């Protein structure tokens, strides 16, 4: 006789504390703030339902499928210590709910409608466990850390970069000049600012040509392999690929994409093109703070970082811990490890809610940039280790003698820190001393040390556990 119509509590179907998670499930940890009067079990079940098979009322067509096979399940709830009316709700999703190789589809399900749900005051996705059965459907980064080092022939140290400033307003020729001076001075990379696409004062093709000239000239003069992150981000996917094709024709080693504003579909297409054509891919995270900065609502950056590793990128910006942009040390190192390592153990003290096994998916180099200068070099070398890119925009171009001496100062400081570390010295304790010693034989470094000796950006970090 018909079916039982009407509205029933989500928790009757979607709260299943007895459920044992499967190795193939995608697991999510949500920070849930229910509306007053909504019990946490109902809130957690509502999240599981609305991000999987559920809707607000029982529907006749439920009888045509097996909910037990396809529904998301809230399988554990724990109160957040020190916060009133906040809970971590763990949800397991069966693998079949997601299209293979599509970050777009994964996010449409897990963080789609549910974030506007009335029964919740706020909702934040803190972490995702991506099972190998799903991650294996992605290509991942075009090349990964080891292949990049082999392409660049640079080992045993972090790589050095610089974002060209002023970010907007330079002509293509003057822009190329700044690129040449930085690379000639000793940097490995220079970078298009994320805002630089193809504006009236500098069209993309002109910039690509002048930057390519700067790369080849500096390579010939230094004997080192150089690169400039040519931003291929554009208004359409077709235009983006057209720019990447032109970069490949010029013979440059690396292009760049703004993955959140550009979108995961565009990013994954570009990553596939880059692997097929031997281009490295630098990823900028413009817009991330819109999504990840609020503690109780949105998505933590570690989720965006995991999504990028699946979608594909060889570098991604990841905060500095010491400069002008967000970053709490343990939490930052938590998602840095999620980007670089194959296997990362669950560690709540670093914000890692699940053990993550990437199997053989290539790693991503974290990029530290934003308000950093030569005095930060020992701390950065110690915190990020060799597999990282340290990017000094103002910290290169703000040098009192100009761009090339700014690059020299950064390279000398980095080499001094790496040598000191290799000799067994403690960078955290002796950092300032190491920089002072090096500045005695490098006038460029001495001048940089003088300019930035007092600069600190001290605010409370927002990103706490």
UniProtKB/Swiss-Prot annotation:
Cofactor: binding comment: Binds 1 Mg(2+) ion per subunit.
According to its UniProt record, how is this protein modified after translation?
The disulfide bond which can form in the large chain dimeric partners within the hexadecamer appears to be associated with oxidative stress and protein turnover.
A GO MF term? ribulose-bisphosphate carboxylase activity
Question: What subcellular locations does the record give?
Answer: Plastid, Chloroplast
Enzyme Commission number: 4.1.1.39
Keyword check for Oxidoreductase: yes
Name its co-factor(s): Mg(2+)
Q: Which residues bind Mg(2+)?
A: 191, 193-194
The active site is formed by 165 (proton acceptor), 284 (proton acceptor)
Does the record bear Transferase in its keywords? no
Q: Name one GO biological process term.
A: photorespiration
- What GO cellular component entries does it have? chloroplast
- Stored InterPro entries: RuBisCO, RuBisCo_large_chain_AS, RuBisCO_lsu_C, RuBisCO_lsu_C_sf, RuBisCO_lsu_fd_N, RuBisCO_lsu_N_sf, RuBisCO_lsuI
Pfam families linked to this entry: RuBisCO_large (PF00016), RuBisCO_large_N (PF02788)
Main localization category? plastid
Chain positions of site Transition state stabilizer: 324
Q: So what does this thing catalyse? A: 2 (2R)-3-phosphoglycerate + 2 H(+) = D-ribulose 1,5-bisphosphate + CO2 + H2O; D-ribulose 1,5-bisphosphate + O2 = 2-phosphoglycolate + (2R)-3-phosphoglycerate + 2 H(+)
Residue numbers of N6,N6,N6-trimethyllysine PTMs: 4
Q: Indicate which residues the UniProt annotation says bind substrate.
A: 113, 163, 167, 285, 317, 369
Query: What does the miscellaneous comment read?
Result: The basic functional RuBisCO is composed of a large chain homodimer in a 'head-to-tail' conformation. In form I RuBisCO this homodimer is arranged in a barrel-like tetramer with the small subunits forming a tetrameric 'cap' on each end of the 'barrel'.
**Functional note:** RuBisCO catalyzes two reactions: the carboxylation of D-ribulose 1,5-bisphosphate, the primary event in carbon dioxide fixation, as well as the oxidative fragmentation of the pentose substrate in the photorespiration process. Both reactions occur simultaneously and in competition at the same active site.
- Record's protein name: Ribulose bisphosphate carboxylase large chain
Record the organism.
Acer saccharum (Sugar maple)
């Amino acid at each position: 006789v018909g079916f039982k119509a009407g509205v029933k509590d989500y928790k009757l179907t979607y709260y299943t504390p007895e459920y044992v998670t499967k190795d193939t499930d995608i697991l999510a940890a949500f920070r849930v703030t229910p509306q007053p009067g909504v019990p946490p079990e109902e809130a957690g079940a509502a999240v599981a339902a609305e991000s999987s098979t559920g809707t607000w009322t029982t529907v006749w067509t439920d009888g045509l499928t097996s909910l037990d096979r396809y529904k998301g399940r809230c399988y554990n709830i724990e109160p957040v210590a020190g916060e009133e009316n906040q809970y971590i709700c763990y949800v397991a999703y069966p693998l079949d709910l997601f299209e293979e190789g599509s970050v777009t589809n994964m996010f449409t399900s897990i963080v789609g409608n549910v974030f506007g749900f009335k029964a919740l005051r706020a909702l934040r996705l803190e972490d995702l466990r991506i099972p190998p059965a799903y991650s294996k459907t992605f290509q991942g980064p075009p090349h990964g850390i080891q292949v990049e080092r082999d392409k660049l022939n640079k080992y045993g140290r972090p790589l050095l970069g610089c974002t060209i400033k002023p970010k907007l307003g330079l002509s293509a020729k003057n822009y190329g000049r700044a690129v040449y001076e930085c690379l000639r001075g000793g940097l490995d990379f220079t970078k298009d600012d994320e805002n630089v696409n193809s504006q009236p004062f500098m069209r993309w093709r002109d910039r690509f040509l002048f930057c390519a000239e700067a790369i080849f000239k500096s390579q010939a003069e230094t004997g080192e392999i150089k690169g400039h992150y040519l931003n291929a981000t554009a208004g359409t996917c077709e235009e983006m690929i057209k720019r990447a094709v032109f970069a490949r024709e010029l013979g440059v080693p690396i292009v760049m994409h703004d993955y959140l504003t550009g979108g995961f579909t565009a990013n994954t297409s570009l990553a596939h093109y880059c692997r097929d054509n031997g281009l490295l891919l630098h990823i900028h995270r413009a817009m991330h703070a819109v999504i990840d900065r609020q503690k109780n609502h949105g998505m933590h950056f570690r989720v965006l970082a995991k999504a990028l590793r699946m979608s594909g990128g060889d570098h991604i910006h990841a905060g500095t811990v010491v400069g002008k942009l967000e970053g709490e040390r343990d939490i930052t190192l938590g998602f840095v490890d999620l980007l670089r390592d194959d296997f990362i153990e669950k560690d709540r003290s670093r914000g890692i809610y699940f053990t993550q096994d990437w199997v053989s998916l290539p790693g991503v180099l974290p990029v530290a940039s934003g308000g950093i200068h030569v005095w930060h070099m020992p701390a950065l070398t110690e915190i990020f280790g060799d597999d990282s890119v340290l990017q000094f925009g103002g910290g290169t171009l703000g040098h009192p003698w100009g761009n090339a001496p700014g690059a020299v100062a950064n390279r000398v400081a980095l080499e001094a820190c790496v040598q000191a570390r290799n000799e067994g010295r403690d960078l955290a304790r002796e950092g300032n001393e190491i920089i002072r010693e090096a500045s005695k034989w490098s006038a460029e470094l001495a001048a940089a040390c003088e300019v930035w000796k007092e600069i600190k950006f001290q605010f409370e970090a927002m990103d706490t556990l």
